[in-house]
Amino acid sequence: MTEKPNHAEAMASTTAGDTGRASDAGRNEGQPDPRKASIETDADYAALDSTARAVLDFWFGEPGTTGFGQPSARWFKCDDAFDTTIRERFGATLAAARRGEHDSWQGTPLGALALIVVLDQFSRNTCRDAAQAFAADAKALEVARRLVESHGDRHLPTAEHRAFAYLPFEHAESLEAQRESVRLFEALARETGQTGRGSYVDYAHRHAVIIERFGRFPHRNIALGRVSTEEELAFLREPGSSF
């Protein structure tokens, strides 16, 4: 996701090879009856603000379609055409969300997720390699924290929906948020069986290690006008240091 080489690039390998993905039976173990979940999802989608619905349909696919809630390679790679599409379709939505004009979306779990996608993902797509890519991170984290505290994340329709609800924790330059990211992605991994290299939980741990070491993400330093330390510069020369 620029920093979209952020976690998002991380999951490209999972999308391509899907390491350790559980069987359908295992994936649903301990989960709600899928038929009931489908009915609930339809009702929740019907109640959404039309713009929030457009965001979710664009990012995760429409309910009932083959690709709904399935990993998408476009999430995780730098693609100028895809970024332009987001900028043209949702640039005004992002600006409004940053001003708090879509805070009412938080009334439902799906609405909160739509707001997170706009603030956390669309910012990165539309402002790659610039400080504005991270300008909405604090607000996205607030929304994600409320969603998790209310257990609303448990009502999201698929594992991919839940993963994007958790990414603001992973993107935060905060050790407390990183620990919560690891906790959330470990719980999700136990349910899905996705634990290998390139999985969400793998990248949650990698992000947390960097914050434990540096207290910030060194690969953001240039965009944010920060001076890198010698240790950070050495780290940035290592493979995989920028996700």
Spans of features found by a protein language model:
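Intrinsically disordered, low-complexity activation-like regions
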Residues: 2-4, 29-130, 134-243
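N-terminal intrinsically disordered, low-complexity tails
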Residues: 8-32
